[in-house]
């Protein structure tokens, strides 16, 4: 009998422990207030995968902080609003995130949430799960129901009528046009046969919050298997196959490129590592692959590598006389979150065998860029 009692007590203790753990999944303060939040995402644009995926909110999470302490957290799947989050009246900090995947947010302090980072992934390249954040927001909750993003009429405390804006952490860089118009010196002699589009010197890691998301992590990613050792080449550099695409002629409706993270290369001195979008392929002479003395001469001119392949790199959002920008936009020498960098490339001569070296102002390339919000940047490049 005693054994049976102890056994039953043990089961009860285990059950209580399990219940406690379930309750901790989303800590809620039983207070005198609730808050409901409606979200506004940036406009959708055609992606490399499914267009709507760029703005898809697969999971929306709202957190309420009392100082550093997480007072409440609630999530909704495939929704742009989270309602009736139980909390307490008073000054609070609101944190909103979307598409956080398996990221563990329950119980994190405000400082810990602000310090969160993300890494560039293969899944991002099909616009899947583009993480979004809004900067932490100070609000004052009143006893009863509180609302953000709802009509200002009706019951409760309407903190703001406009939906809360949330932005993608990623940016998009893409060719929307590549055309070959050889100048008189090369016309009817040289042609370019494109084979690949590469993303080069892409930041591996990004912060999720802050005026800039660029952090001190020194790791970069490339789609090319070639080691260039150029002036821009970072020391910590890894190849990933998903920053490489087989060439398909880009159009405005079917851009060709990659999603990337913030990168700042605006320093006036010292080493910079600019993010590059690059088209790669064969340089041909009189319709044939380069061989013999023609290949040797092109190599000596730093036009091609040993296989007669050439690169046409475009430094994204970069200030250069070879680049023009739409709508009077001033290039910032950086990749910024939630920006879409659309690039039109005109090739007027041979390229380079080292896309991670500075290009000369007389390079055979013209670039035209557009930026929008998504902030669109239109960039035009001529090689």
Curated annotation (Swiss-Prot):
Lipid moiety-binding residues (S-diacylglycerol cysteine): 19
Main location: other
Residues bearing a lipid moiety (N-palmitoyl cysteine): 19
Modification after translation: Synthesized as palmitoylated lipoprotein precursor. Efficient export to the outer membrane and integration into fimbriae requires lipidation and subsequent proteolytic removal of the lipidated propeptide.
PROSITE patterns referenced in this protein's UniProt entry, alphabetically: PROKAR_LIPOPROTEIN
GO molecular function (one): structural molecule activity
UniProt family annotation: Belongs to the bacteroidetes fimbrillin superfamily. FimA/Mfa1 family.
Entry protein name: Major fimbrium subunit FimA type Ib
Organism: Porphyromonas gingivalis (Bacteroides gingivalis)
Gene behind this protein: fimA
């Amino acid at each position: 009998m005693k054994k049976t009692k102890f056994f039953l007590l043990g089961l009860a203790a285990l059950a209580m422990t399990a219940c406690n753990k379930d309750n901790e999944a989303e800590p809620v303060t039983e207070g005198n207030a609730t808050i409901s939040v409606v979200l506004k995402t940036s406009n959708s644009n055609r992606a490399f995968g499914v267009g709507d995926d760029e703005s898809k909110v697969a999971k929306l999470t709202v957190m309420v902080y009392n100082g550093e302490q997480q007072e409440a957290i609630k999530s909704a799947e495939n929704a742009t609003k989270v309602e009736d989050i139980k909390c307490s009246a008073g000054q609070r900090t609101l944190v909103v995130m979307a598409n956080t995947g398996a990221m563990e947010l329950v119980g994190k302090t405000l400082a810990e949430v602000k310090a969160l980072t993300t890494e560039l992934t293969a899944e991002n390249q099909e616009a899947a799960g583009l993480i979004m954040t809004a900067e932490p927001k100070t609000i004052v909750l009143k006893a009863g129901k509180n609302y953000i993003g709802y009509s200002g009429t009706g019951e409760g405390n309407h903190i703001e009528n406009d939906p809360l804006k949330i932005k993608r952490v990623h940016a998009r860089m893409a060719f929307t046009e590549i055309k070959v118009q050889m100048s008189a010196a090369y016309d009817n002699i040289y042609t370019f046969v494109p084979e690949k589009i590469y993303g080069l010197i892409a930041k591996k890691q990004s912060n999720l919050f802050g005026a800039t998301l660029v952090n001190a992590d020194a790791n970069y990613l490339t789609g090319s298997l070639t080691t260039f050792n150029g002036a821009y080449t970072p020391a910590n550099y890894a190849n990933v196959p998903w920053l490489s695409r087989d060439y398909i002629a880009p159009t405005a409706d079917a851009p060709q490129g990659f999603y990337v993270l913030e990168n700042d290369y605006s320093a006036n001195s010292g080493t910079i590592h600019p993010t590059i979008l690059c088209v790669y392929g064969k340089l041909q002479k009189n319709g044939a692959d380069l061989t013999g003395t023609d290949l040797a001469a092109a190599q000596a001119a730093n036009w091609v590598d040993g296989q007669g392949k050439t690169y046409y790199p475009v430094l994204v959002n970069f200030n250069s006389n070879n680049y023009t920008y739409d709508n009077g936009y001033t290039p910032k020498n950086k990749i910024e979150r939630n920006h879409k960098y659309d690039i039109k490339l005109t090739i007027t001569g041979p390229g380079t065998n080292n896309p991670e070296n500075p290009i000369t102002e007389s390079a055979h390339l013209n670039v035209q860029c557009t930026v929008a919000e998504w902030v669109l940047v239109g960039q035009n490049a001529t090689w």
